[in-house]
Amino acid sequence: MRIVCLVVLVLLAPGCERRSSRGSAGWKAVDGGIVCEGGGLQHLACTGLYGEGGKGWERRAVAAGIRAFEPGLQLWSDGLEKSRFIQLPPGTRIDTSRPDEWRFPPGTKLWKEFRWKGKPIETRLLWKKPEGKWLRTTYRWSDDGQQATELTDGEKNVPGTPGHEIPSQVDCLTCHGGREDEVLGFEAVALGHEAARGLTLAKLVEEGLLTHPPEPPPRIPGSGVDRAALGYLHMNCGVSCHNTNPLALGGGGGLLLRLEAAELGSVHLTDAWKTAVGVRSIFRTTGLFGDAVPRIAPGDVKRSTLFHRMSARGLPVQMPPIGTHVVDEQGLGLLQRWIESMPATAER
């Protein structure tokens, strides 16, 4: 089933450019630096992160005009450390007329670097080209950290990591297809969170970089326990997969976990509450012969299939289905505390 879904995604996805890492190098190393040739992007230095045309590679200092950001809600990546950067073309703004679906100006670039115990593993690039198509690709760092070259077919079980998997371009689309304009972590709820750093929602508003600044800024409803769980589900499940976008792979089953601007008035208005709490699941708690129970059984973790799926790895029911081989115990704890805080009620 997953293979069929991926094929459909590739066929239907609008405005995406597929690349191959095979072919001419497009770059050469000269005196410790990188010289880019022919407009190629086969080396990270050629993407503009450290300077144009390979400039700045020796120092690895991010170029002027590129902003670091850290969303207050983050995707679990098996414990790898991450750094994120964005570049908006001068004089442009992000179209935020639809608060849940930001649209980025052509020329926008985003980078995300993954490290394990301080060692760079990969850097991903999203670039909205002038014609509006998104280019998605990944750069694999060499073991000595001196080069980062394009890898489009992915790599499983990267040596020296807890099984980290570098996604192929099709794998990238599996998640990024869940957004109308591809970008996942640079959005209102995560950037407006109190834990956000760098280029936050407040700074975007202050600098006039949004066409329609949110009024009021989005705030996750409920108690601290509610907010922590809803925020975790939003970023790890809802933004990319469990939402109503046509290419979001998890939306068809009826479980919706993205926080929408119009539903932040109370916990009970959120899609996560309405589609999960007390709602019967098609999955069972323990395999084929387990109990038929709700996605979230109020007050009862053992009878909540959402908790069981997030606890699973290496099984078809694991959640998220890709991109992780290690259970996020801290995130699981947020969900457990939320479920246990709910008074037991009649199931729907």
Give the residues covered by each predicted segment:
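Short alpha-helix capping/helix-loop boundary micro-motifs
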Residues: 93-99
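C-terminal motif of bacterial Sec signal peptides marking the signal peptidase cleavage site
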Residues: 13-15
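Sec-dependent signal peptide recognition
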Residues: 1-6
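N-terminal pre-domain segments of enzymes
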Residues: 20-87
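Short, well-ordered loop/turn sites that connect or cap secondary structure elements
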Residues: 104-107
